[in-house]
Structures are given as C-alpha cells and as structure tokens.
C-alpha cells in the first residue's frame, strides 16, 4: 500500500504534506491550544482535519486557510464541520492576517501543523502581523523549534531566534515522533507556542534595520562582528555600546541586537525604497 495515501488523499510532496494521525498527540495539542467559543480561531493547513475536527467541536465558527484545492473541497462538504467553517483556499504566505483580525473584530488565535518546507518564511510573514495576533501554536520540525527558542552562545541561535524573540514569547510545548504522521517525515517534530509581546521588551525604531543587522551578522556567523558588521559599526561605536567587537553573531543577545539597530536607525537611517 502507498504510505503517502491517508483517508483516500495522496499526500503531495510539493505541499510538504504529512498528516497527523496519533490521537494522543492530537489531544495534547488541542489541550495546549485550549480553544474557546467566541475566539477568532484560524487554522493554517488543516489538511485532513486531524486538528480541525477536535478544535471545531469546541467552537461555533472556525476559519481555515488551505492551499490544496482538493482538501479545501473536502472540508467544504465535511458532515459536521462544514457549516462552521470559513475556508480561504489560498497560500498562507500571501494571506493578510491584519485584514482578517479587523473583519473578526479581535486578535487572531492562529494554529496549524505547518508544511515544513515553508515553515521559516511563514514565521517571518506572521511576525509582520503580531499586532493582529493573540497567540500561535504550531507543529514544526523540531530543529526549527530549537532555533526559535535558542538563546545566545548556542549553535541553534540565529536570525530566526532573534526575530522570533523580538516579537514573541516563545514556549516549547511537546515533542512529536515521526510515527505520529502519515507518511512519517524523516525528522522529529515539536509543537511551539508563540505569544506576541503586549509591550515590546526591546522596541526598535526601524524593524528593517534589525532585519538587516541580523542578516549580515548571521550570514557570516563564524566572523567576529568587528568584521561581519564592520561596514555598519566602528570598533569605537560597538565598545561604546558595551558590545565586544571580538564577539560572533551567536554571542550577541536580542537586547544587544536591538540596541545596535536603534543606534543605526538614529545615526544612519535607511532610505525609503
């Protein structure tokens, strides 16, 4: 039997489809999400409704975003979920979550078993809507969750860690083995909770500057910042901020990156493109 077929649907590699089928894991995730009636719940990539059904049971309405036309059609005709669902058959990577929150009159609670091939770019897309989001619960590749929660001085710490923690409080929830899916992925998975900060702990004046600094630093992570960021900061400026120029990208805290971004925004602002 083709192990890519689950509930009569052939998992599509180009959509990165792996369907969750372990009831204990499903119950644990739904319990962590704790959906309540009246909340603006939004699922990305509902697939064969492994999470959609138990979450939908607790709600009067649920919004789902599904790129796969066949799966969106299945949900439309679902015996008990159908009437509760608002289905957007489109790519979450281009979806306007701000408009949806405005339409629903409250911040969104977003969740999903995300396709691993788009999880990192989708995170960055969602970070741009954190004003419109109450919280997020996602199943991701375990390695991505490790990067989201990593602190300085660790191999997993990178640009994703800095940007995620700038916007959100990041909390690992549970680990999930490949056997919980059909077809089983080649990697371990984990569930993470991201709660956008009500008050930014380290506000920056221009997010594009923070994005640029972290990109340049981590693209050359083995170099000291004296070298990787030498085109942006002199040794004197770094020292004046209390940042050792001999440190590497992975040694610098989120607070320090934000401090550097604010210095640059004030002293060498980016031109509007």
Curated annotation (Swiss-Prot):
It is found in: Cytoplasm. Its EC number is 2.1.1.182. S-adenosyl-L-methionine binds at residues 18, 20, 45, 66, 91, 113. Keywords: Cytoplasm, Methyltransferase, RNA-binding, rRNA processing, S-adenosyl-L-methionine, Transferase. It holds the Pfam family RrnaAD. InterPro entries: KsgA/Erm, rRNA_Ade_diMease-like_C, rRNA_Ade_Mease_Trfase_CS, rRNA_Ade_methylase_Trfase_N, rRNA_adenine_dimethylase, SAM-dependent_MTases_sf. Its main location: cytoplasm. The keyword RNA-binding applies. Signal peptide: none annotated. It comes from the Bacteria. GO terms for molecular function: 16S rRNA (adenine(1518)-N(6)/adenine(1519)-N(6))-dimethyltransferase activity; RNA binding. GO terms for cellular component: cytosol. Specifically dimethylates two adjacent adenosines (A1518 and A1519) in the loop of a conserved hairpin near the 3'-end of 16S rRNA in the 30S particle. May play a critical role in biogenesis of 30S subunits. PANTHER family: DIMETHYLADENOSINE TRANSFERASE (PTHR11727), DIMETHYLADENOSINE TRANSFERASE-RELATED (PTHR11727:SF7). Belongs to the class I-like SAM-binding methyltransferase superfamily. rRNA adenine N(6)-methyltransferase family. RsmA subfamily. This is Ribosomal RNA small subunit methyltransferase A. It comes from Shigella flexneri.
């Amino acid at each position: 039997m083709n192990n890519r077929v689950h509930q009569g649907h052939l998992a599509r590699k180009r959509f990165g489809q792996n369907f969750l089928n372990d009831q204990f894991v499903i119950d644990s995730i739904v319990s962590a999400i704790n959906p309540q009636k009246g909340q603006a719940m939004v699922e990305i990539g509902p697939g064969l409704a492994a999470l959609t059904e138990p979450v939908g049971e607790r709600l009067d309405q649920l919004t789902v975003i599904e790129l796969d036309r066949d799966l969106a059609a299945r949900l439309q005709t679902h015996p008990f979920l159908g009437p509760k669902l608002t289905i957007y058959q489109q790519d979450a990577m281009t979806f306007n979550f701000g408009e949806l929150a405005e339409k629903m009159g409250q911040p969104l609670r977003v969740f999903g078993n995300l396709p691993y091939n788009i999880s990192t770019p989708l995170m960055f897309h969602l970070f741009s809507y954190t004003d419109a989001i109450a919280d997020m619960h996602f199943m991701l590749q375990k390695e991505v969750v490790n990067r989201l929660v990593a602190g300085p001085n660790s191999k997993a710490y990178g640009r994703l860690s800095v940007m995620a923690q700038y916007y959100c409080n990041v909390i690992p929830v549970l680990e999930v083995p490949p056997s919980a899916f059909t077809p089983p992925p080649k990697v371990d998975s984990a569930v993470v909770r991201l709660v956008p900060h009500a008050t930014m702990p380290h506000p920056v004046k221009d997010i594009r500057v923070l994005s640029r600094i972290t990109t340049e630093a981590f693209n050359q992570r083995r170099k000291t910042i004296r070298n990787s960021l030498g085109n942006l900061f002199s040794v004197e400026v770094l020292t004046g901020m209390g940042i050792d120029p001999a440190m590497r990208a992975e040694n610098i805290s989120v607070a320090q990156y934000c401090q550097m971004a604010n210095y640059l925004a004030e002293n060498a602002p980016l031109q509007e493109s």
